[in-house]
Amino acid sequence: MPVKLATALSNNLFPALDSQLRAGRHIGIEELENHVFLMDFQEVLEEFYSRYNVELIRAPEGFFYLRPRSTTLIPRSVLSELDMMVGKILCYLYLSPERLAHEGIFSQQELYEELLSLADESKLLKLVNQRSTGSDLDRQKLQEKVRTSLNRLRRLGMIYFMGNDSSKFRITESVFRFGADVRSGDDAREAQLRMIRDGEAMPVEGSLSLKDDSDDNDRTDDTAPETGEDE
């Protein structure tokens, strides 16, 4: 075993970080210690994970995640259609001027209102109940499902809840996994809006996902670690 790989695997950070990556979590600069570790050992860890038929990816925005190949030896699951739509909306909000105005913080209600304004409400309700009649009960169920999707994306490192207030969150750059492909000269926010309204698929269908048990109640690692840098 190469000396540098042995050093990485024996590091106290590695066991928990490895578990998070295998579970689908995205590691951005918000998790400074883990991010620096991955930067330092990226090359040897790429070789290590290739043995499991997954790729350690460093995205252009700087965050890390594992991308499985079709022959992966690590269990995986796929995000639901609603999860992916919520992810697209989060990416749209990240690109919005409001993110800077609000210091990057949004509320669940703002997310829900943006979702209804940009996507077809009848199609959203069908995701919750195929026989939806557009009743208040159906809308209530949709809002609950959106909260569940948001919590699932939190577990993947896409957002952080603000302290003990789960109604507010900060979006991380990892939401660019849900971003539209932008050609040179195109406006990124407009491209994202087109993808949302056209219902285009986004390229995370092969991504790893955390187990979905207790999504609504799991509050582990809700808040961003303290770092010396703002997002």
From Swiss-Prot:
Q: Which UniProt keywords apply?
A: Cell cycle, Cell division, Chromosome partition, Cytoplasm, DNA condensation
Composition bias, Acidic residues: 213-231
Region Disordered, annotated ranges: 195-231
Which is an annotated Pfam family here? Answer: MukE
Q: Which InterPro entries match?
A: MukE_C, MukE_N, Scp_MukE
Q: Where in the cell is it found?
A: Cytoplasm, Nucleoid
Q: Name one GO cellular component term.
A: cytoplasm
Q: Which GO terms describe its biological process?
A: cell division; chromosome condensation; chromosome segregation; DNA replication
Recorded superkingdom: Bacteria
Spell out the subunit comment.
Interacts, and probably forms a ternary complex, with MukF and MukB. The complex formation is stimulated by calcium or magnesium.
Q: Name the protein family.
A: Belongs to the MukE family.
What this protein is reported to do is described as: Involved in chromosome condensation, segregation and cell cycle progression. May participate in facilitating chromosome segregation by condensation DNA from both sides of a centrally located replisome during cell division. Probably acts via its interaction with MukB and MukF.
Q: What is this protein called?
A: Chromosome partition protein MukE
What is the species of this protein?
Answer: Pectobacterium atrosepticum (strain SCRI 1043 / ATCC BAA-672)
Q: Gene name?
A: mukE
